[in-house]
Amino acid sequence: MAKKGSTLLVKLASSAKTGFFYVKKRNPKKLINKLSFRKYDPVVRKHVLFSEEKLK
């Protein structure tokens, strides 16, 4: 069997505080800083900044 990968699932929460989020994989060995992307938020119908949070 293959070894379990080291990638983690993280939640990218909208900075517009709409409650909308994306789930993304990340490799903790390569990325030290928190992820942040400018992506589309369908609740406000605009591109906003999405920042990394812990996935519960």
Swiss-Prot record:
Presence of the UniProt keyword Ribonucleoprotein in the record: yes
Alphabetized UniProt keyword annotations: Ribonucleoprotein, Ribosomal protein
Name of the protein this chain belongs to: Large ribosomal subunit protein bL33
Taxonomic source organism: Ehrlichia canis (strain Jake)
BP-aspect Gene Ontology terms: translation
GO cellular component, one term: cytoplasm
Presence of keyword Ribosomal protein: yes
InterPro entries associated with the record: Ribosomal_bL33, Ribosomal_bL33_sf, Ribosomal_zn-bd
HAMAP family found in the cross-reference section: Ribosomal_bL33 (MF_00294)
Assigned protein family: Belongs to the bacterial ribosomal protein bL33 family.
Molecular-function GO term, any one: structural constituent of ribosome
Annotated gene: rpmG
